[in-house]
């Protein structure tokens, strides 16, 4: 059984100071300023002293066809010296004057008590007289330049467009994994993440960089784990970092002494290790379950966790392709964004190059 549409009661308070309409005459005979028209399952009207909360106050100069437009709510009224007609349904055979609504914060007396209430004020001009026939036939097609009549009626055309839209292939703009990651970002991080996705070079750029720098840097497979539960372990980590930097520096010196033509054996700098150590010590909940790992000259990752806006100097810079989940060393320099990615159960921190 088809369910009936629920009807909401609308209260219109007609203010006709000249008493040229039936509403104004009834209000004047009762020594009241307003005539209330209540539209619901039935239509009723009576003189009242003041409007009610959430009511429409329609100020009119005299008889006319008025249509109150409040968003999707439309109320059509015919006010004449001898009668009143009103409806919230479609009423298209007559012309109406469209009246816009202005919400106002007021104090009115309601049920014997002064209350703060919102009323909606609208003013009609009386430019459309009651019961003026609408000469526009909805079934006729007007002569419009550049417009031809369709072979379908309006319902068939809408159904045709709907079927074409549903049958058309849809491109997946954002994966489920990306949406899950965005839930853990604040507004600034999400904005930076979107900017990083726009700037990240495509597959062709990544392949060119891989060919150009394939013989420049060697992979570094050293993995450093930080355990940050106790302060004494933090001190040991700092000492370990210093020893590793010293070892890497010695290796660089030996490489330079051996031959001036050989390239550096590692792209990991002291500044990078210090910055990474500080990020790990922040104990971000998103990284607590992951152990930290040094990035290789090129490699892959499982997922992007977050991109932070950080300014680092003298650090290895990477370009990466999020669709292929690959990253590639670009050079050593300065960055303004740092990407945090995960591979297996390891956290990899990648400064983003230009």
UniProtKB/Swiss-Prot annotation:
Q: Indicate yes or no for the key word rRNA-binding.
A: no
> Acidic residues composition bias: which ranges?
250-260
Q: Where is this region: Disordered?
A: 163-196, 229-269
**Function recorded in the entry:** Single-stranded RNA-binding protein.
**Coiled-coil spans in chain:** none
Which SUPFAM superfamilies does the entry mention?
A: BTV NS2-like ssRNA-binding domain
Q: Residue spans with biased composition (Basic and acidic residues)?
A: 178-196, 237-249
What keywords sit in the KW lines? RNA-binding
Q: Which InterPro entries match?
A: BTV_NS2, NS2_N
Q: What is this protein called?
A: Non-structural protein NS2
Q: Give one GO term, molecular function aspect.
A: RNA binding
């Amino acid at each position: 059984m088809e369910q009936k549409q629920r009807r909401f009661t609308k209260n219109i308070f007609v203010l006709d100071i000249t008493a040229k309409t039936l509403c104004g005459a009834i209000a004047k005979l009762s020594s009241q300023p307003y005539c209330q028209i209540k539209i619901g399952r039935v239509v009723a009207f009576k003189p009242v002293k003041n409007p009610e909360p959430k009511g429409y106050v329609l100020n009119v100069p005299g008889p006319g066809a008025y249509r109150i437009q409040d968003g999707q709510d439309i109320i059509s009224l015919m006010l004449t010296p001898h009668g009143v007609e009103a409806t919230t349904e479609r009423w298209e055979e007559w012309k109406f004057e469209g009246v816009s609504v202005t919400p106002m914060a007021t104090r009115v007396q309601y049920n014997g008590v002064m209350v703060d209430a919102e009323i909606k004020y609208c003013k009609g001009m009386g430019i459309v007289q009651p019961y003026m026939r609408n000469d526009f036939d909805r079934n006729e097609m007007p002569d419009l330049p550049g417009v031809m009549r369709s072979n379908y009626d309006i319902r068939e055309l809408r159904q045709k467009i709907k079927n074409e839209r549903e049958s058309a292939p849809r491109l997946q703009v954002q994966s489920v994994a990306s949406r899950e990651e965005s839930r853990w970002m604040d507004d600034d991080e999400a904005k930076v993440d979107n900017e990083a996705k726009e700037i990240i070079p495509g597959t062709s750029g990544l392949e060119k960089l891989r060919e150009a720098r394939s013989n420049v840097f060697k992979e570094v497979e050293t993995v450093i784990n930080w355990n940050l539960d106790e302060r004494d372990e933090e001190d040991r980590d700092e000492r370990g970092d210093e020893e590793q930097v010293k070892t890497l520096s010695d290796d660089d010196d030996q490489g330079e002494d051996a031959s001036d033509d050989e390239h550096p054996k590692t792209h990991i700098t002291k500044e990078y290790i210090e910055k990474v150590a500080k990020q790990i010590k922040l104990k971000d909940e998103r990284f607590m379950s992951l152990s930290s790992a040094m990035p290789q000259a090129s490699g892959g990752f499982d997922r992007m966790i977050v991109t932070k806006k950080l300014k680092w100097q003298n650090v290895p810079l990477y370009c990466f392709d999020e669709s292929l989940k690959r990253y590639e060393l670009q050079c050593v320099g300065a960055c303004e964004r740092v990407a945090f990615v995960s591979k297996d159960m390891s956290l990899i921190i990648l400064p983003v190059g230009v």
